[in-house]
UniProtKB/Swiss-Prot annotation:
Disulfide bonds join C376-C443, C405-C475, C409-C477. Homodimer or heterodimer. Can form a non-covalent complex of the mature region and the pro-region. GO terms for cellular component: extracellular space. Growth factor involved in osteogenesis and adipogenesis. Plays an inhibitory role in the process of osteoblast differentiation via SMAD2/3 pathway. Plays an inhibitory role in the process of adipogenesis. Residues 331-343 have a biased composition (Basic residues). Pfam families: TGF_beta. It comes from Bos taurus. Residues 34-70, 267-345 are annotated as: Disordered. This is Growth/differentiation factor 10. Glycans are attached at N118, N155, N280, N469. The gene is GDF10. Residues 1-33 form the signal peptide. SUPFAM superfamilies: Cystine-knot cytokines (SSF57501). Coiled coil: none annotated.
Amino acid sequence: MARGPARTSLGPGSQQLPLLSLLLLLLLRDADGSHTAAARPPPPAAADGLAGDKNPQRSPGDVAAAQSPGAQDMVAVHMLRLYEKYSRRGARPGGGNTVRSFRARLEVVNQKAVYFFNLTSMQDSEMILTATFHFYSEPQWPPAREVPCKQRAKNASCRLLPPGPPARQHLLFRSLSQNTATQGLLRGAMALPPPPRGLWQAKDISLIVKAARRDGELLLSAQLDSGEKDTGVPRLGPHAPYILIYANDLAISEPNSVAVTLQRYDPFQAGDPEPGAAPNSSADPRVRRATQATGPLQNNELPGLDERPAQAPHAQHYHKHELWPNPLRALKPRPGRKDRRKKGQDVFMASSQVLDFDEKTMQKARKKQWDEPRVCSRRYLKVDFADIGWNEWIISPKSFDAYYCSGACEFPMPKMVRPSNHATIQSIVRAVGIVPGIPEPCCVPDKMSSLGVLFLDENRNVVLKVYPNMSVETCACR
């Protein structure tokens, strides 16, 4: 009978003690984990606030950082996030149009790790806006001190005193005139407060980079100096530093700028004949626009049913009335159904040069061309960089919707083609016919949008450029 009360009296205590012990163990484990667990590096900090982006949907840059083999390559991950940001928001990177990244080359100088950056790939037309140095910093704890063992105690044990405060680091920048591991000219020094844990940091080095470029010394070295010599052999790992330079390329709006920066070789090498050139023609690497066969894709006109390839060199030049039969001309009133039944075939047969198709085929062709607008308008065109041989160095996008403008600008021009005053007068003069040889206005792009391209330069550095006038938004007669 005595066992029953004892069991009931100990019951509540036996339930509370395990709970308290479990809670204490969890607290101790969390406290130890805050000091011993390996810190996971956050996304690289940048002046544009990418690290603070809390989009719940994972972007391709985040997926690449977590899954791809190059997940440790923070340069590629950071540049991909910049590309996604400016492609999505349509903004200009740092107020400019160019972001260049530069990887570090590790050298050991006086038993200390020194990181070298080759900035010579910057173009003269690129005006530097800002430059940031991205590096991974960890607290440098001094070695712990050992406490002498107490011999008087029954269970004598030795312990280590907790280490003192972490050492203060200095970030040193030097510029070099030659690509050698020398001291160089000191360009700047920054005192870094000890970080609470291992994390990525970014420092503004715009003045340093601008001064080095002004003096023609585009080889920079960076060193994290804590006063102690590095133990072991330094290696470039996943935490290698890098430099980002935001610039405004003044030549990006010049004609043919996209080919100047993205084309790695001439498609028509010197000595190689151009496609379609005569066997005994001279090997001039320049593209001869005047001698190229003129077709509907070159003169912004849609092909007609009776268009056939030229049979002789003198047959390359056509007049509009020779290529377009009367029923297919734009802005002509469509005849009634009864008139088409009676006169449609006779009129078409009298003006067309194609006589080898049956009536059913011709009706299908006529219906297809009536469905497609003949007036000046935007047409769909998708450009794949693999088709022009640029996919080897272009990272993203692989393709884009470029569109193009094509169609007729005949008098009277509707409002939808947004003709200029000059185009309106030109179409009237052409329609009157007093001045011979006046062509009709051309269907050209009116409004265009830019395109961000992420690619590798000749030094295998990742570059982001926002090219203007890459995709057609609207077309007009000019």
